[in-house]
Amino acid sequence: MKEKLLEKFKELFGNADGVSLYFSPGRVNLIGEHTDYNGGHVFPCALTLGTYGAARKRNDRLVHFYSMNLDHLGVIEASLDELVNKKEYNWANYPFGVVWAFAEKGYTLDCGFDMVIWGNIPNGSGLSSSASLEVLTGVILKDLYGIDALSMTDLALIGQYSENNFNGCNCG
């Protein structure tokens, strides 16, 4: 998968110099679904299924998202100067919501970034495909922008905050 991500990144953005690679697993709750956001107990387990990403900083304020799973949608472009959910962003509202949540929490990004993803979690399967994408995005932002103060728990909570408040989805 590493080679395919880098190849697609190079095809889309001219080269793959300075690109970092990432992975975020999906998860299953062994004691049932929909208990997390209803205040119930959870017993999650990470999976080998997940979301892979390649990313690097840009020299402007633009953010480019591309999903190898949704080639027909092409590159989705957003701006750090307009952190709003737009219908035309489609699936990219999930990672862009994490960018928004970082800003809401006081972590501003000095420049944009390019990101290519591919995932093998079936959408709607209850295996947390959106959470995987949100945590992946959080890890990418933490790494690219040197935000060392954030823990993995912080990143998970930022993902939840973005999905609840930017995308309007009740999740845990």
Regions found by a protein language model. Give the residues of each.
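ATP-binding N-lobe of GHMP and related small-molecule kinases
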Residues: 1-131, 135-152, 157-167, 171
